[in-house]
Each structure stands twice: as C-alpha cells, then as structure tokens.
Amino acid sequence: MATTAQKIKEVEDEMAKTQKNKATAKHLGMLKAKLAKLKRELITPTGGGGGGGLGFDVARTGIGTVGFIGFPSVGKSTLMTQLTGTRSEAAAYEFTTLTTVPGVLQYNGAKIQILDLPGIIEGAKDGRGRGKQVITVARTCNLIFIVLDVLKPMSHKRIIEEELEGFGIRLNKEPPNIVFKKKERGGINITNTVPLTHIDLDEIRAVCSEYRVNSADIAFRCDATIDDLIDVLEGNRVYIPALYVLNKIDSISIEELDLIDRIPNAVPICGNRGWNIDELKETMWDYLNLVRVYTRPRGLEPDYSEPVILRTGHSTVEDFCNNIHSSIKSQFKHAYVWGKSVPYPGMRVGLSHVLLDEDVVTIVKK
C-alpha cells in the first residue's frame, strides 16, 4: 500500500505534467485540494508520541517568540549568542545544534524568547531528518528568522519557503478574506464583492466536491486564488511574519551586498563580527507588532522603567487592565491617556479605547 509521501509524489507528478489552461483548471483545482489533504496527514501528529519530540519543544517565556530556521551551519548559533548571550554550540561543521536552544532577549523593556532550532534539510516537510519536529515548533512562533548564508546559493531561500509552506505556514501573508459557512442543504452559494481574476465557479465547486462539501455559503471579499480557498477549507494554516537574515556579509563585495539588500523583508548581518545586529533588533521589534504602554499613578510621574507590553490588535484599555491584574476591570471607572492614540494629552477614555506604542495611562477606579 502506498505511503502518504508516495501518494503526494504521484499527485505532484500529475500536476507537473498537466498543462494549465481553462480546460484543465477544474482538474488542477481538484488535484491541489487532494494534495492539501494528503499533506495534512503529514502535518497532523500521529498517536502515541505527541509533542515536538525530545529536546525540541520548550517552555514559553516572554511576550513573543522568535524562531531561527535555516540549513545547518548558516550561523544560527552565533546569532543566538549575539542576541541573547546564550551559548548554543557552534562549529564549522553541519548539524552542530541537535535540539532547540532557548534564550531571552531583553529589548525595549520586553522579554522576547529566541529559539535556535536545529538545521533543517530539503524534504523536511515530507519527514526527512528532524524537519517535522523543527517545523512543528516554528508553527507556534510569533516571528520566524530565516537565516541564510550569503555564500550559499540563494535558491536555499525558496527551498526553505517551500518546506514551511508545505507544513501549513504562510509567511508574510494575511489570511484570505473568504467567509466559508457550511450548511445542511441548498447547494454551493458563491458571492464576491471584488472581481475574481484567478479562480472561476467550476474550480470552486470542484474543490468543494473534493472536500465533500455539498452545501455552503462562500463569500469572497478578496481576489483569491484556488490555494487561498484550500487554505480556508483546511483551517489549519498559520500566518507568521518572517525576516530573512542574510549572514556572513563580511565575505562578499559591496556590489554583491547591494544586490542581496534588495530582497524584501531582509536584513544583512555578520554574526561573527556583530555587524548590523542593532538594525536586526529594531526590525524584529517592528515585525512583532508589540505595543509598550506606561503606567502613571494619579498625581505622580509616569513609570518608564517597566512598560506593560501588549500586542497590536489586542491593545485596548481593557487588555491593558487585564495584563496588570484581572480585578482591575471590575473596579474600572475611566482612564486618562497621553500619547499617539489620543488627539490631546490626558484625554478621558473607556475600556474599548485602542492604545498605541508608548502611550501613558492613568486608571481611575470606582
């Protein structure tokens, strides 16, 4: 009986030899859906073991987690030491790091957990090496550093992207704005608020058929692709920001550096020499979307020594109160805010007010 990996190979081979045109679009849609279902079997943990595997998953600390992903010996361990002071064994041979090595970076008043993950190899998503355990941990991170050696082929970048995508990780993307609601009867009802230029009704119905969805309301609020629809139907995708950390720039020319500096979402560094580490930290902070909020007791000056750290999208005054202590919300009367989120200093606000980075807040209790 064919294994899941063999079935995946068969579907991929059939897709590769199928010419893409209007006549084959429906068939390709069904093949993509079938492929996604097979890959789900690799993503979903099988019974018995569970977890990320011995030495892979670690207890979480801090307000956010950054995971290092890359091929062996690209400089992840050296970068870990530069950022956190945690010494992850580093050497000039491959597979130095065999387990997840955690460290903590203190930055802008926040504790950020850094995970140096073992190097992955091509085919990780299909179970080769320790790839499955490594990528399982990466799925839980708030930000991924894809560490690349600039002396190695830049094709490594695409290989790693494909490994992560094959495991349900979507890099630097927002979830597609597709509303899917399954129902008991009535057939497939499709609506769209924008023109659909990448997908047609037959493809949509073919994909639904592959998932045995006979009745559903599907509302497209973006110009989606067939892959976007499959991601929504699968329901197990994670959308994680990623930075491409281009290491060992001390070994290339200025002209070569100028070329790689054009790569989107990239920061060139030299881990051994500590070059550009400060810019990497600043960019990391921006990508984590963290919000620092300072407390100001009534009648006193603001306390800038220890900010309350919130996340963009979860930074209301109510979130601020809950972060300090769960009892504050029940005693809350109103708050005064100074900073970018208000039109004038000391504005009186309620629980639903959204705070911005470096706001100052005074809570008034009943």
Swiss-Prot record:
Keywords: GTP-binding, Nucleotide-binding. GTP binds at residues 70-77, 116-120, 247-250. InterPro entries: Beta-grasp_dom_sf, DRG, G_OBG, GTP-bd, GTP-binding_2, GTP1-OBG_CS, P-loop_NTPase, Small_GTP-bd. PROSITE patterns: G_OBG, GTP1_OBG, TGS. Residues 64-289 form the OBG-type G domain. The keyword Nucleotide-binding applies. Pfam families: MMR_HSR1, MMR_HSR1_Xtn, TGS. GO terms for biological process: cytoplasmic translation. PANTHER family: DEVELOPMENTALLY-REGULATED GTP-BINDING PROTEIN 2. Belongs to the TRAFAC class OBG-HflX-like GTPase superfamily. OBG GTPase family. This is Uncharacterized GTP-binding protein C9.07c. It comes from Schizosaccharomyces pombe (strain 972 / ATCC 24843). The lineage of its organism: Eukaryota, Fungi, Dikarya, Ascomycota, Taphrinomycotina.
